[in-house]
């Protein structure tokens, strides 16, 4: 009994570590990118090319990791990697278009809508069902973050199409990460190492043209300064941790859990934006933050309640012992797969 509890503690600690890394790096990169791309900052308005830089550094880290033996390379069909990279790149480009063509309020609403979209996709693709408590907690989080972020909503046809494309492709991308990991028994960082070079090459080739369409300027016309270069390097470093932690989180948790818990980052961004960039903070923002946090607490309780209900279901009949043995065998295999996915345990 004590041995089982001791085995759960490292897993719980690594789960918290992966989530903390994701929140810190995700919030940090938003702050760095805002300073880098805003007109009051360095005016580097080439978001798609910048994302190419991010994946180029991530690919380099993956190559070094494979060369030094920190991670093993497993085979994944090239067509699956190309398909996933295409979906991921469409997601990034559509998000940039959505942010450009829509108000910040509508852009945030489109991000919130990924939660129900992921739920529907997991229901359709994986026949996954959710309890009433989980559904209610998702609604509380959506309402809370919606109140917190939405100020004005100005919808136009092009922006709406881009937002819908971004929501669908990003939701599909997040579900695909978990599916590929399970299908090929591949670790999160190993999968990232395989897709990052493809995404880097494609974004660096087509990114400048996308950015020209968005801003009317080519990156070659930008006057680079030492401070701007340092900010770009900081952004790239944070992107590496953000990408790694995103794969770790989705590998450990379901895509829906990642989406719901991910809106904690929105609250952090709004708070830091208010403190650092003097963004407006109204009573509605504060009330939304509180409601979102309450929703996340309810969500945690609902998930634990659902686990307890499933654990109390004891199979009856003459084949019950065989089913128990199969269940234990499956849990052992899944436990081994999880250890393989834990990047921190590779060379700890």
Swiss-Prot record:
<feature type="transmembrane region" description="Helical">
    <location>
        <begin position="257"/>
        <end position="277"/>
    </location>
</feature>
<keyword id="KW-0812">Transmembrane</keyword>
<keyword id="KW-0050">Antiport</keyword>
<feature type="transmembrane region" description="Helical">
    <location>
        <begin position="133"/>
        <end position="153"/>
    </location>
</feature>
<dbReference type="GO" id="GO:0015297">
    <property type="term" value="F:antiporter activity"/>
</dbReference>
<dbReference type="GO" id="GO:0005794">
    <property type="term" value="C:Golgi apparatus"/>
</dbReference>
<keyword id="KW-1133">Transmembrane helix</keyword>
<feature type="transmembrane region" description="Helical">
    <location>
        <begin position="12"/>
        <end position="32"/>
    </location>
</feature>
<comment type="function">
    <text>Nucleotide-sugar transporter that transports UDP-rhamnose or UDP-galactose and UMP in a strict counter-exchange mode.</text>
</comment>
<keyword id="KW-0472">Membrane</keyword>
<feature type="transmembrane region" description="Helical">
    <location>
        <begin position="230"/>
        <end position="250"/>
    </location>
</feature>
<dbReference type="GO" id="GO:0000139">
    <property type="term" value="C:Golgi membrane"/>
</dbReference>
<feature type="transmembrane region" description="Helical">
    <location>
        <begin position="196"/>
        <end position="216"/>
    </location>
</feature>
<comment type="similarity">
    <text>Belongs to the TPT transporter family. TPT (TC 2.A.7.9) subfamily.</text>
</comment>
<feature type="transmembrane region" description="Helical">
    <location>
        <begin position="81"/>
        <end position="101"/>
    </location>
</feature>
<feature type="transmembrane region" description="Helical">
    <location>
        <begin position="44"/>
        <end position="64"/>
    </location>
</feature>
<keyword id="KW-0333">Golgi apparatus</keyword>
<dbReference type="InterPro" id="IPR004853">
    <property type="entry name" value="Sugar_P_trans_dom"/>
</dbReference>
<dbReference type="GO" id="GO:0048354">
    <property type="term" value="P:mucilage biosynthetic process involved in seed coat development"/>
</dbReference>
<feature type="transmembrane region" description="Helical">
    <location>
        <begin position="286"/>
        <end position="306"/>
    </location>
</feature>
<protein>
    <recommendedName>
        <fullName>UDP-rhamnose/UDP-galactose transporter 2</fullName>
    </recommendedName>
</protein>
<dbReference type="Pfam" id="PF03151">
    <property type="entry name" value="TPT"/>
</dbReference>
<keyword id="KW-0762">Sugar transport</keyword>
<dbReference type="GO" id="GO:0022857">
    <property type="term" value="F:transmembrane transporter activity"/>
</dbReference>
<feature type="transmembrane region" description="Helical">
    <location>
        <begin position="104"/>
        <end position="124"/>
    </location>
</feature>
<dbReference type="InterPro" id="IPR050186">
    <property type="entry name" value="TPT_transporter"/>
</dbReference>
<feature type="transmembrane region" description="Helical">
    <location>
        <begin position="160"/>
        <end position="180"/>
    </location>
</feature>
<keyword id="KW-0813">Transport</keyword>
């Amino acid at each position: 009994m004590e041995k089982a509890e001791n085995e759960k503690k490292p897993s719980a600690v690594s789960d918290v570590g992966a989530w903390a890394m994701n929140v810190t790096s995700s919030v940090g990169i938003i702050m760095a990118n805002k300073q880098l791309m805003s007109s009051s900052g360095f005016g580097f308005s080439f978001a798609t090319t910048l994302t190419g830089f991010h994946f180029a550094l991530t690919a380099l880290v993956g190559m070094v990791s494979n060369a030094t033996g920190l991670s093993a390379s497993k085979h994944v069909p090239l067509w699956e990697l190309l398909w996933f990279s295409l979906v991921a790149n469409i997601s990034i480009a559509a998000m940039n278009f959505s942010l450009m063509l829509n108000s910040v309020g509508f852009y945030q609403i489109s991000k919130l809508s990924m939660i129900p979209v992921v739920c529907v996709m997991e229901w359709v693709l994986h026949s996954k069902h959710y309890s009433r408590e989980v559904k209610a907690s998702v609604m509380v989080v959506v309402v809370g973050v919606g109140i917190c972020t939405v100020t004005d909503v100005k919808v136009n046809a092009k922006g709406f199409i881009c937002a819908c494309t971004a929501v669908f492709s990003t939701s599909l991308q997040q579900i695909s990460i978990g599916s590929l990991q399970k299908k090929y028994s591949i670790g999160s960082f190993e999968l990232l190492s395989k897709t990052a070079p493809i995404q880097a090459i494609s974004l660096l080739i087509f990114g400048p043209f996308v950015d020209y369409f968005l801003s009317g300027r080519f990156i070659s016309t930008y006057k680079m300064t030492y401070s701007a270069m340092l900010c770009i390097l900081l952004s790239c470093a944070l992107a590496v941790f953000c990408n790694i932690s995103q794969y770790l989180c989705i590998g450990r948790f379901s895509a829906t859990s990642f989406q719901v818990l991910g809106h904690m980052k929105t609250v952090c961004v709004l708070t830091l934006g208010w403190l650092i960039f003097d963004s407006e903070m109204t009573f509605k923002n504060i009330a939304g933050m509180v409601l979102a946090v309450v929703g996340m607490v309810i969500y945690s309780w609902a998930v634990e309640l659902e686990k307890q209900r499933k654990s109390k279901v004891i199979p009856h009949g003459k084949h019950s012992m065989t089913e128990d043995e199969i269940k234990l065998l499956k849990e052992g295999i899944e436990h081994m797969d999880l250890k393989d996915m834990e990047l921190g345990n590779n060379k700890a």
